[in-house]
Regions:
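Conserved ATP-binding N-box helix of the HATPase_c
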Residues: 99
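An acidic/histidine-cluster motif and surrounding catalytic segment
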Residues: 1-91, 102-134
Length: 134
C-alpha cells in the first residue's frame, strides 16, 4: 500500500464529494486481501468472484457515509494488467468507492464510461493538490 498522507486524502475526498454537492460523514476503509473481499462479496452480495472494491453505502441525501473494502491484491493485479503504477491504481480504486457514495454507478449501459471519466477527473484533482503542496 502506498504511503498515504491522511490530511491530503481527506482534503481530496472532501473536494470530490463537494463536486457532487455532498459533505463527508463517517467513511471507513478496510484494506484486505483477495480471500477477504471474496468472502465479503459472497456473504453480502451473493457474488462468487474477486473484485477490487466493495462499497456499502449508508449515505443521507447530502452527506456521504459508508464502508469501503479494497483488495490490495486485486489493486496490484489490476495495475499490472492495465500497465499502471500500483500507486495510481490504488488511488483510482480508493476514489471509486467515494464516487459510488456520491451516486455514480458503473453496472448499467454507459455507466462504466461515466465512472471512468469521474475517476480520471478525481485523479487530476489529487495530482493538482500534490503539486500545490510541493
Amino acid at each position: 500500500m502506498p504511503r498515504v498522507d491522511k490530511s491530503l486524502m481527506h482534503e481530496w475526498i472532501e473536494a470530490v464529494a463537494r463536486g457532487f454537492g455532498k459533505s463527508l460523514g463517517d467513511i471507513s476503509y478496510i484494506f484486505c486481501n483477495d480471500a477477504k473481499i471474496l468472502e465479503v462479496n459472497r456473504q453480502f452480495l451473493n457474488h462468487d468472484y474477486f473484485t477490487d472494491v466493495i462499497t456499502f453505502d449508508y449515505s443521507r441525501p447530502h452527506r456521504i457515509s459508508g464502508d469501503i473494502f479494497i483488495s490490495l491484491d486485486t489493486v496490484a493485479s489490476n495495475a499490472e494488467m492495465v500497465g499502471a503504477t500500483y500507486e495510481r491504481e490504488f488511488y483510482r480504486v480508493f476514489i471509486h468507492g467515494i464516487l459510488h457514495l456520491c451516486g455514480v454507478n458503473d453496472k448499467g449501459p454507459g455507466e462504466r464510461e461515466i465512472m471512468e471519466r469521474y475517476e480520471d477527473e478525481s485523479l487530476d484533482i489529487l495530482t493538482n493538490m500534490i503539486a500545490r503542496k510541493k
